[in-house]
């Protein structure tokens, strides 16, 4: 019987070997992708639990199937913990992803064809903030705002002027590659000035907001969305918050039955566990380490003339570096660093001149290395190794030395033991 197949190594060696290789890769690679993190064993255990068997269309107390008393309790805990973390009156923990959370938020706030302002992708925005290849750009009339070409920071006077010209029904704040504090109160003022709603996508900074290290958008936004991974250090998934009861009803309807069927209750349970971790005082210590590491790394790059840190620094968990004085483009840098077991991603920079498949920059994030235990000393070392590798792209002896030093760091800070 299939129920006897407890040992998936014996039952499906191909998958087991692939997972083992990924475990090995994560153990011996330095992870700097800003949207990735390292979850606890408790989060993984909840996500791998028997809850994966249960279908539960609807919401706690209002399900379409029977046998949901237990999952009602679990989802209720996730909701209450999310509300406590962010000081919100209402929370929907069912979105399968941040993109689906954003989709539901749009459905609750606007109609197809409505004009929306969102951050330009090359300035740091996200695909779901109006990119033409995304459902957002195909369903709504998005007009992009950017950053100041000199400072590479948000220019609220320019955004206000643009909003007065285009008269959006909705303004979307938040980013996936913007390294400074976002003043949500100013976005609220702009939205009010033109009679628009305000939605904030805080997917990248949610953990910093939860720790009190970045201003919260929840008091200002009509709807706030986020992922539950990234700096929140939970399972991959989405979350929607609001203080408006009528919007909460629209959000719930947009998620189910609007764009999703049954929630992934095993993931909801993992979200609940992660939220409990966030409520622990130790999480703020972790979040502060994220910031300290990012600022230390950015400073290393700022001290090298061949590298340019976009907007001259960082106030959150990430920063961008223009690498075109050292290597051809960001893709080349990403691939080269992959070869020395440092993982990050190519990234467009403001007013980008290269294609998104090449880019002028790379994006560096510190959430995963902070979770692993790296402090400022190790983070500075990682930045130096990146520079060393990129400046010696054709020197195999130097690259071998970098690989060896990466291995020393990863061996000193192991991820997990005995998972596979």
Swiss-Prot record:
Functional description taken from the UniProt entry: Catalyzes the reversible interconversion of serine and glycine with tetrahydrofolate (THF) serving as the one-carbon carrier. This reaction serves as the major source of one-carbon groups required for the biosynthesis of purines, thymidylate, methionine, and other important biomolecules. Also exhibits THF-independent aldolase activity toward beta-hydroxyamino acids, producing glycine and aldehydes, via a retro-aldol mechanism.
Pathway, per record: One-carbon metabolism; tetrahydrofolate interconversion; Amino-acid biosynthesis; glycine biosynthesis; glycine from L-serine: step 1/1
Keyword Disulfide bond applies: no
Chief subcellular location: cytoplasm
Ubl conjugation recorded as keyword: no
Family membership: Belongs to the SHMT family.
Binding site for (6S)-5,6,7,8-tetrahydrofolate: 121, 125-127, 246, 355-357
HAMAP family reported for this sequence: SHMT
NCBIfam families: PRK00011.1
GO molecular function: glycine hydroxymethyltransferase activity; pyridoxal phosphate binding
Protein name: Serine hydroxymethyltransferase
Catalytic activity: (6R)-5,10-methylene-5,6,7,8-tetrahydrofolate + glycine + H2O = (6S)-5,6,7,8-tetrahydrofolate + L-serine
Modification N6-(pyridoxal phosphate)lysine, positions: 230
Site entry: Plays an important role in substrate specificity: 229
Compartments, record wording: Cytoplasm
Keywords on record: Amino-acid biosynthesis, Cytoplasm, One-carbon metabolism, Pyridoxal phosphate, Transferase
């Amino acid at each position: 019987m299939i129920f006897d197949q407890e040992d998936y190594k014996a039952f499906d060696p191909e998958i087991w070997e692939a997972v083992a290789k990924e475990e090995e890769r994560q153990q011996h690679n330095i992870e700097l992708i800003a949207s990735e993190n390292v979850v606890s064993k408790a989060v993984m255990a909840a996500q791998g639990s028997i809850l994966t068997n249960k279908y539960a269309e609807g919401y706690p107390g209002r399900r379409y199937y029977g046998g949901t008393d237990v999952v009602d309790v679990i989802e209720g805990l996730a909701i209450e913990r999310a509300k406590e973390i962010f000081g919100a009156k209402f929370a929907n923990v069912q979105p399968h992803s941040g993109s689906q959370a954003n989709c539901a938020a749009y459905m609750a706030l606007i109609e197809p064809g409505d004009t929306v302002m969102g951050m330009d992708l090359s300035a740091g925005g996200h695909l779901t903030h109006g990119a033409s290849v995304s459902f957002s750009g195909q369903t709504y009339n998005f007009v992009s705002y950017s950053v100041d070409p000199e400072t590479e920071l948000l220019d609220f006077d320019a955004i206000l002027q643009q909003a007065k010209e285009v008269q959006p029904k909705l303004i979307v704040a938040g980013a996936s590659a913007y390294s400074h504090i976002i003043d949500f109160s100013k976005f609220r003022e702009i939205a009010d000035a033109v009679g628009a709603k305000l939605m904030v996508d805080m997917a990248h900074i949610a953990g910093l907001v939860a720790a009190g290290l970045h201003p919260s958008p929840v008091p200002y936004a009509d709807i706030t969305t986020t992922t539950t991974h990234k700096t929140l250090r939970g399972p991959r998934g989405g979350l929607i918050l609001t203080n408006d009861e009528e919007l909460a009803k629209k959000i719930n309807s947009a998620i189910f039955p609007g764009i999703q069927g049954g929630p992934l209750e095993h993931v909801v349970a993992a979200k609940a566990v992660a939220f409990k971790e966030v409520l622990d005082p130790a999480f703020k210590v972790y979040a502060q380490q994220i910031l300290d590491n990012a600022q230390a790394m950015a400073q290393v790059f700022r001290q090298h003339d061949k590298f340019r840190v976009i907007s001259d620094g960082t106030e959150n968990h990430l920063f961008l570096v223009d690498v075109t004085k050292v290597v051809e483009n960001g893709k080349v840098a990403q691939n080269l660093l992959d070869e020395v077991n440092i993982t990050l991603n190519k990234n467009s920079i403001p007013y980008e001149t290269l294609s998104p498949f090449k880019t002028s920059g790379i994006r560096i994030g510190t959430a995963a290395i902070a979770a692993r235990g790296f402090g400022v000393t190790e983070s500075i070392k990682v930045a130096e190794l990146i520079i060393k590798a990129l400046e010696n792209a054709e020197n195999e002896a130097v690259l071998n030395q970098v690989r060896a030093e990466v291995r020393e760091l990863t061996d000193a800070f192991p991820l997990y033991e005995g998972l596979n």
